[in-house]
């Protein structure tokens, strides 16, 4: 069971694949069995992305499996889910997506203090292969540096 403030689903590849320029927290419209499934810790947003549809922002390709119970209430597992944002925030994000060629990547789905499902979105720009290699080299160097300092001191 996922407690308030804890992460229900996380996109661990997002920070490796993209430069995260800014982060935004949004509400997400879910049906009851989707919420129950997320509370159990099921759900996958590794292949998900957010984008405009009919003047609104939606989360596409997020996988939330059906909740297993005695009374099945089936829902579509990869349906587009509406994101709940203020109009100003939505306009800012839509202009960044269309004009600047950026992407909205879901970073995690968590439950707020009142038990409401929230999604953390990152406004991101894609990394090239050499950027990924540079990040790996820097991470390895920091790890080696910490190891040297620990062994020496």
From Swiss-Prot:
> What GO biological process term is on the record, naming one?
trans-translation
Q: Name one GO cellular component term.
A: cytosol
The secretion signal range is: none
An annotated Gene Ontology molecular function: RNA binding
Record Pfam families? SmpB
Classify the main location: cytoplasm
Q: Tell me the keywords, alphabetical order.
A: Cytoplasm, RNA-binding
* Cellular localization per UniProt: Cytoplasm
| Family per record | Belongs to the SmpB family.
What is the purpose of this protein? Required for rescue of stalled ribosomes mediated by trans-translation. Binds to transfer-messenger RNA (tmRNA), required for stable association of tmRNA with ribosomes. tmRNA and SmpB together mimic tRNA shape, replacing the anticodon stem-loop with SmpB. tmRNA is encoded by the ssrA gene; the 2 termini fold to resemble tRNA(Ala) and it encodes a 'tag peptide', a short internal open reading frame. During trans-translation Ala-aminoacylated tmRNA acts like a tRNA, entering the A-site of stalled ribosomes, displacing the stalled mRNA.
Name of the protein in question:
SsrA-binding protein
Q: Give the organism, scientific name.
A: Paramagnetospirillum magneticum (strain ATCC 700264 / AMB-1)
């Amino acid at each position: 069971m996922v407690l308030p403030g804890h992460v229900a689903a996380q996109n661990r590849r997002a920070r490796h694949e993209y430069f995260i320029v800014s982060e935004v927290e949004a509400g997400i419209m879910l049906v009851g069995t989707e919420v129950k499934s997320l509370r159990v810790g099921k759900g996958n947003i590794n292949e998900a992305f957010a984008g405009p549809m009919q003047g609104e922002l939606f989360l596409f390709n997020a996988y939330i499996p059906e909740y297993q119970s005695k009374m099945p209430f089936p829902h579509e597992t990869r349906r587009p889910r509406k994101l709940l944002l203020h109009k100003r925030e939505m306009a800012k994000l839509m202009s960044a997506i269309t004009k600047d060629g950026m992407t909205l990547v879901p970073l995690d789905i968590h439950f707020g203090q009142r038990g409401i499902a929230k999604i953390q979105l990152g406004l991101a720009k894609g990394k090239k292969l050499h950027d990924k290699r540079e990040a790996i080299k820097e991470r390895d160097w920091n790890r080696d540096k910490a190891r040297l300092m620990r062994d020496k001191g």
